[in-house]
Regions:
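N-proximal low-complexity "stem/linker" segments adjacent to membrane-targeting elements
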Residues: 1-24
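Short beta-strand/loop segment that forms part of the nucleotide-sugar
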Residues: 9, 32-41, 60-63
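Short, acidic, metal-binding catalytic loop of nucleotide-sugar glycosyltransferases
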Residues: 23-32
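A conserved acidic beta->alpha catalytic loop
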Residues: 39-48, 87
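Glycine-rich, basic loop-to-helix element that forms the pyrophosphate-binding segment
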Residues: 62-78
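Short aromatic/hydrophobic "clamp" motif used to bind/position activated sugar donors
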Residues: 83
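Conserved donor NDP-sugar-binding/catalytic core segment of glycosyltransferases
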Residues: 91, 95-127
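Conserved nucleotide-sugar donor-binding catalytic segment
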Residues: 129-218, 223, 230
Length: 305
């Protein structure tokens, strides 16, 4: 017995990478699948690449409402039992589909399977292992430990609990995992399934302030309060971006606490008063904790998280 996979790729001006994505999908074996690419009207070499493979996949190129809208369109245009969503700059590793199919076939109660992924550079070279963790929904609220191309889910999840939130620009995958995870436990497959492209021009890395703002906003809407970990992550990104604007090398700053302290120098009038008290390591630690706490509550008041 086999399951039919539906593979969906949203695309926009990723001509330098999309052929590698396509080849990684078409190289999958022992699994029946159909492949749909929803392009948003690319103006680079993307369409030439798609035409090259059009006898082995389906594609459409037209204006859309963004990445989430393109994925939703692809899901609606396919009929497979298992949905695999991979962006146009990522890759699957050999036998990924067959490994995932084995779980879905032998454990019919499992609705979502996820595995390990690598961060890779523009030349497909290994950077680091994505920090995937065993399933824990409470932990998922604190940190997104699922790498998007390494997640596969049954179509019934879409039918029962909806598709991607097309109003989100960055964290539509994280929101979907939180929504689905509230309904069922995900199966953690300890296998390397995908490579996620990690470079400066990726949407997530290139717009970090907007990404973290949207994540906090989404979490507040879903859980009425954004976890402290995400608020402080947003604070750290704000400080780093501020340093870049000032033309300084963020990597040379000593610690995250120092970054936050410096940011607070402009945010709080009491900075000089408490800094003068920092005469011993223990006092410095107490002051740093106070700074972070005050900054944390100030940030919540400013961004309403």
């Amino acid at each position: 017995m086999t399951l039919n996979f539906s593979v969906v790729t949203p695309s926009y001006n990723q001509g330098q990478f999309i052929e590698r994505t396509i080849q990684s999908v078409l190289a999958q074996t022992d699994v029946a699948f159909d492949y749909m690419i929803c392009d948003g009207g690319s103006t680079d070499e993307t369409l030439d690449v798609l035409k090259k493979y059009q006898d082995r996949l389906r594609w459409v190129s037209e204006p859309d409402g963004g990445q989430a809208d393109a994925v939703n369109k692809g899901i609606r245009s396919t009929r497979g039992d298992i949905i695999a969503w991979i962006n146009s700059d990522d890759v699957y590793y050999p036998e990924a589909f067959s490994k995932v199919q084995r779980i879905f076939l032998t454990q019919p109660e499992v609705q979502v399977v996820y595995g390990h992924a690598n961060h890779i550079d523009q030349e497909d070279k290994f950077i680091e292992l994505y920090p995937t963790e065993p399933w824990n929904y409470r932990r998922l609220r604190e940190v997104c430990f699922l790498c998007q191309p390494a997640v596969f889910f049954r179509r019934r999840m879409v039918k029962d609990y909806g598709d991607l939130d097309a109003d989100l620009r960055f964290c539509m995958d994280y929101e979907l995992w939180l929504r689905y995870g509230k309904q069922t436990d995900f199966f953690y497959l300890s296998e390397l399934l995908a490579g996620s492209r990690f470079y400066h021009d990726t949407k997530t890395l290139g717009q970090r302030v907007a990404v973290h703002y949207e994540i906090n906003d989404m979490l507040k809407a879903k859980f009425f309060r954004s976890p402290e970990r995400w608020v402080l992550a947003y604070a750290s990104v704000l400080v780093e971006e501020r340093e870049k604007v000032k033309g300084r090398d963020v990597g040379n700053l000593l610690t995250p606490v120092q970054r936050i302290n410096e940011f607070c120098a402009e945010a709080f009038h009491g900075y000089r008063r408490w800094r003068n008290l920092a005469v011993s390591p223990s006092t410095i630690w107490q002051v740093s904790r106070w700074t972070i706490a005050v900054y944390y509550h100030w940030l919540r008041s400013k961004v309403n998280f």
